């Protein structure tokens, strides 16, 4: 497995730590989420939110966005140098929803970024606690992954909308560090690289001069991140070619798109972490839970436990289905937007439906929406079982390449067959195998053709009862894997627009 040697576990990336043992990792992740919780409690006090208002996920998101904006140095610098009308670069804010006379009202608040930074540092023992900020970014990214489709972005970069399952983390900001890089899908990395190459094609100075040198370093770093996600020698060799190219152009874009397609069967390793809204950590801290002492993990039972005991509310629009809103948030909490619906349904204990069948829009509410008709409901975020989150793509036979599914990137380490339409995927690989990467392309296509949909992934891995915190008795579910289990099936979600 890839975790030996120099690779750090996600928790180490998450907390910026060097190699630590399991107890130290649990403690530092605990310290991170505890800091988020303390910050949230303090913000609720500042804003004079009632207990109910503090548990409203929309308020949580506004508070999270404020602290992310307060620490976004690059944007803050940009705003100060390019003053735009009506935007104070030193302030941040957003909508806070309050309960007044049996109705919800929206209040726009504004705070000094300096003040927010002070409250955040105070909650995190005087440190900047970048890891906690990244954690919030990943929660927002997971929520976007579950809520929006990226068809337009895929088509714009010359990729195929059917590659949507490779797009995890596509809305993460660049500054999300190693922990952010770990959760980005193959398609996300490919898209970032293609955008970069296209700029280089259109702008002669992009790779030149002092700036160009920095650009080049960033390009090679992104190539290495993507290379690290691939699990076969041929895919990695192709990434070396892309990285070493003197001036990257259309040939590299072709190679990258080829690699992205190949990842539908020879899947990359993409990390999954359960990142919860700040209000959930706040509730736990407020009830006296000591995260640092107890320890915490983003990939084990802890987030499931936390959600079993947390009551979070959400605003609901007049024609939305509260159960569907709950499903959306549940998927976001467990980073399960790209997981097979049958696996998610089994773990959750209620049927998880494809996005095309959801009667709900996103969680956030636009400033022009009418508050008069808004209602609020409890989100049902509990689960029947828990399972370990995975970082492998679910390729079988000793983590070499094998069967994948055209629209799934597994989240949970649970045994299943990964059905895929080989014919559909292979159709995309007709033709071009000449050029400098021909032997690698031929090798990749050969591996894909020999992949068998009936191979079992995560052999022997199962889910666990919530009472089984040491994961001693795996329950291996049996699924009817005859049909497509993708969340994006019959998709009609709105596009993600910044």
Swiss-Prot record:
It is found in: Virion; Host nucleus. A motif (Unconventional nuclear localization signal) lies at residues 1-18. Belongs to the influenza viruses nucleoprotein family. Residues 1-21 are annotated as: Disordered. InterPro entries: Flu_NP (IPR002141). It comes from the Viruses. Signal peptide: none annotated. This is Nucleoprotein. It holds the Pfam family Flu_NP. Homomultimerizes to form the nucleocapsid. May bind host exportin-1/XPO1. Binds to viral genomic RNA. Protein-RNA contacts are mediated by a combination of electrostatic interactions between positively charged residues and the phosphate backbone and planar interactions between aromatic side chains and bases. HAMAP family: INFV_NCAP. The keyword Ribonucleoprotein applies. Keywords: Capsid protein, Helical capsid protein, Host nucleus, Host-virus interaction, Ribonucleoprotein, RNA-binding, Viral nucleoprotein, Viral penetration into host nucleus, Virion, Virus entry into host cell. It comes from Influenza A virus (strain A/Anas acuta/Primorje/695/1976 H2N3). One of its GO terms (biological process) is symbiont entry into host cell. Encapsidates the negative strand viral RNA, protecting it from nucleases. The encapsidated genomic RNA is termed the ribonucleoprotein (RNP) and serves as template for transcription and replication. The RNP needs to be localized in the host nucleus to start an infectious cycle, but is too large to diffuse through the nuclear pore complex. NP comprises at least 2 nuclear localization signals that are responsible for the active RNP import into the nucleus through cellular importin alpha/beta pathway. One of its GO terms (molecular function) is structural molecule activity. GO terms for cellular component: helical viral capsid; host cell; host cell nucleus; ribonucleoprotein complex; viral nucleocapsid. The keyword Transcription regulation does not apply. Late in virus-infected cells, may be cleaved from a 56-kDa protein to a 53-kDa protein by a cellular caspase. This cleavage might be a marker for the onset of apoptosis in infected cells or have a specific function in virus host interaction. A motif (Bipartite nuclear localization signal) lies at residues 198-216. The gene is NP.
